[in-house]
Structure formats: structure tokens, C-alpha cells
Amino acid sequence: MSRKPLIAGNWKMNLNHFEAIALVQKIAFALPDKYYDKVDVTVLPPFTDLRSVQTLVDGDKLRLSYGAQDLSQHDSGAYTGDISGAFLAKLGCTFVVVGHSERRTYHNEDDALVAAKAAAALKHELTPIICIGEHLEVREAGNHVIHCEEQLRGSLAGLSAEQIGKVVIAYEPVWAIGTGRVASASDAQEVCAAIRKELASLASAQIADSVRVLYGGSVNAKNVGELIAQDDIDGGLVGGASLDGEQFATLAAIAAGGPLP
């Protein structure tokens, strides 16, 4: 099955709503509409930017989509500081990241919570980008594939085969995030292939073949081509490079198969 590449820009805790508008405008200007037939492009701003991004995307009829970096497992109630999937859906979000390593590390989120958040996203017709990945000591011990398979199972626990078919998986080796280090294309392919095999056992081979598996970890315009050329890598969850409109547009154009804009 042919899977359309997805390039997702995770802005993390960067850019106020004025800066968000400027960046989306720059991406839209740098990446002509013709590329969107071959690649899906989404930006993932902070919560406080979403309304401004929605207004711009809708008003200018831009073809890129947008989403959020997290959501609550709850729909509403006395959960101070939380943001529900219902709120994100009302803002027109398409995607939402769950289980990013920074959430797992700094907020002690475990696989059970990630699975609950993924279910909450699907309930509100949002596509969860479910993140998994190993720390350096796990890779150096040679346990990276087993670790990621276990994390995947835990993060999908309770989801039906049909629901699994609606998610995106992002493999993000923790040691490569924001460090400038990047897994080699063959290293990334090894884990992404194992992820797809595990998806087949959890759902079906047909569903596994339809799910997009992204690589995240210092993705940029220089390495995305080699990464996305791998059989089981369908795009990138992009961090720092997504804050540069021209580089992000170039990265998306490469994922679309070129030529450069």
C-alpha cells in the first residue's frame, strides 16, 4: 500500500501567537500548493497559538493542517490546566501528539496514560501521533527494538484494530532529540519495520500496512530524503527545523519527491 508522507512540525514551547502567524505565512509562501498532493504537512503549535493559526489557515484556505502537542484524557471537569480533545476539535485541529518523550520524562506520563490520551483523541476524531522511543543506554545494550515493541503495545492498549488503523506512530530515539545526533537511516528503518510488524500482530497486516510511521529526532532538510526513502518510514516529526519556515518547506518538498521550491 502506498502511504502518503506526513511532515509534522512540533514547535514545542516556542513562538507566541504573532510569531505563529508569521511562521505559517512563511511556510505557505515557500511551499506551493502543488506539493500538498504528494505530502501532508501539519504544524503543531502551543495551545495559545491555535486560534490564530486556525483563523489564518481557514481565512487564506491554506492546504497545510495543524494540531496540538498534547491533550487531556478527560473530556471536561475539574482538571486545572488540562485541554480536552473536544476543545481541540472545535478549533479545527487534525492531529495531536501523545506520549512525546518530553511528556514522558518531565511529566512522568506512562504507557497507560498515553493509551488513554490516544483513545480520547480518537473519540473526538483527532489523529493521535503516538510517540515511542528508547534512551541511549537501552540502545547501547541492544534492547532498543524490544523496548519500542513493549512501549508500542502499552501505548495502544485498549484500542481496537479499527482504532489502531487511525493512528500515526512516531519513532523518536530520545538520544537524538534536540541533540543534533540522528539515527542512521538503517537504524531508524530497523525499528520502524519492527513497529509495523508489531502493528500487524496487534491489528492485522492490512492495517499495519496503512499506518504511517514517522521518524523524529533531529530531522532536517539534509537527512529527511534518506530517511523517507526507507520502506517503513513515512515522514518525520520535526522539531527545531520546523521553526524555520524555509527549511521546513524545503524538508516537505523533499518528502514530496521534489523538486525544491
UniProtKB/Swiss-Prot annotation:
Any one annotated GO CC term: cytosol
First-tier enzyme category under EC: isomerase
Keyword match DNA-binding: no
SUPFAM superfamilies documented for this protein: Triosephosphate isomerase (TIM) (SSF51351)
Main location: cytoplasm
Subunit annotation: Homodimer.
Task of the protein: Involved in the gluconeogenesis. Catalyzes stereospecifically the conversion of dihydroxyacetone phosphate (DHAP) to D-glyceraldehyde-3-phosphate (G3P).
Protein family per UniProt: Belongs to the triosephosphate isomerase family.
Protein name: Triosephosphate isomerase
Organism name: Mycobacterium avium (strain 104)
Gene it is expressed from: tpiA
